[in-house]
UniProtKB/Swiss-Prot annotation:
It comes from Geobacter sp. (strain M21). This is ATP synthase subunit a. Belongs to the ATPase A chain family. The gene is atpB. It is found in: Cell inner membrane. Gene3D superfamilies: ATP synthase, F0 complex, subunit A. It comes from the Bacteria. InterPro entries: ATP_syn_F0_a_bact/chloroplast, ATP_synth_F0_asu, ATP_synth_F0_asu_AS, F0_ATP_A_sf. Pfam families: ATP-synt_A. It is a multi-pass membrane protein.
């Protein structure tokens, strides 16, 4: 989808010689903008750490602490090593979703390449963790408990794991792209009245989609750590 109302659309011309489409250029530019913004925010929040947090430090500690608590509740204490990955994905997706509610900004998660990249990161991490934790025994996760059904179960499990990438990609992309299309249409019809309820709903959708993606990522990684039966 090519967004007609963007502040940074001049980057399209700069990235076109590199083979980027207009929609792809928008996603790349705003992805980098969000990453830089998150890095700057992190540096600002941790520049002068205090025992009793206040201001930006307090705000970030609430967010990070909430993500950590959810991770421990879902994966247990042994899930803490995966906190950096889970928190990074959650914050990036949440900010990517929310930035689309600001007129003139494009949500990278409304581009399927962005959501596919996040899904592939979860998929690859899941199986690297599984192999690292179980070694060659990780293959048992794909064979099932009955030996003579193992070939069929292997095929079914492989399809099931690949479908996770597709579901993670399309769920996030479909919701954010659809909402963006609705906002564009309503902004064209009634720029100052009709979009307001949709933008409020967009805030809710943004948080829900980030939460669902984060939760599924934790569940998939946790599944790779469990012993096959």
């Amino acid at each position: 989808m090519v967004h007609p109302y963007l502040f940074l659309n001049f980057f399209r011309e700069l990235l076109h010689p590199l083979g980027f489409s207009e929609a792809g250029a928008d996603a790349v530019v705003y992805t980098w903008l969000i990453m830089i913004g998150l890095v700057v925010l992190s540096i600002a929040a941790t520049k002068r750490l205090q025992a009793v947090p206040s201001g930006l430090q307090n705000f970030m500690e609430v967010i990070v602490g909430g993500i950590e608590n959810m991770l421990v509740e879902t994966m247990g204490e042994h899930g803490k090593p995966f906190f950096p990955l889970v928190a990074t994905l959650a914050l990036f997706i949440l900010v990517s979703n929310l930035i689309g509610l600001i007129p003139g900004f494009f949500p990278p998660t409304a581009n399927i390449n962005t959501t596919a990249a996040c899904a592939v990161v979860v998929f690859v991490t899941t199986h690297i963790v599984g192999v690292k934790h179980h070694g060659a025994g990780y293959i048992k996760h794909f064979l099932g408990p009955i030996a003579w059904l193992a070939p069929m179960m292997f095929f079914i499990e492989v399809i099931g794991h690949l479908s996770r990438v597709i579901s993670l990609t399309l769920r996030l992309f479909g919701n954010m792209n659809g909402h963006e299309l609705v906002l564009i249409i309503f902004f064209g019809l009634a720029p100052f009245v009709v979009p307001l309820p949709m933008m409020l709903m967009g805030v809710l959708v943004s948080f829900i989609q980030a939460f669902v993606f984060m939760l599924l990522a934790m569940i998939y990684i946790q599944g790779s750590l469990e012993h096959a039966h």
